[in-house]
Amino acid sequence: MKNQSSTITTQPARPAVISGTPEGSGPGRLEVNVIFTDPQATVAALKAAGALARDLGACIQVRAAIPVPYTLPLEKPPVSVGFLQSLLYRLVSRSDLHTFEPSVHLYICRDRIETLVRVLGPNSLVVISGREHWWPSAERRIAKALRSKGHRVVFVGLKRDAKSDLR
């Protein structure tokens, strides 16, 4: 079967881009994994992750799994990789989390949940944010899927009329 994802990793302090295949992180320092959903929700998740990382002495990993429809080749996602990289870099830079050595991992994939399950280490600490609704949102479905695979998931709910910190 053909490879269904590709990886790009960015260190905000040193904007180098590394491409490769997704793989889980090795042993070492505790990681708080922030899942990119949308810019406003990711800012809220980064704030919560900063508090967790401070209390746990952990580093922060921002993971963005961007699904590409089967009608498009994997090498040509609907949103340019350069745009996604700059968006993620700006989000992390504005979050004032440099003391936690945040790094950004961009995965271009077919299935977002499958990719996240594959790249997260066992029993990972995950922070994800999304709008509060009475129906299950995409963010809630991701959180539920990651919990079912044994990860510890913190869901940061956003109010519907929440103001954005993005400017």
Predicted regions and their residues:
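Residue-level marker for well-ordered alpha-helical positions
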Residues: 47, 89, 137-141
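Short, well-ordered secondary-structure micro-motifs
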Residues: 45, 72-75, 115-117, 138-139, ...
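A glycine-rich helix N-cap at a beta->alpha junction
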Residues: 80-105
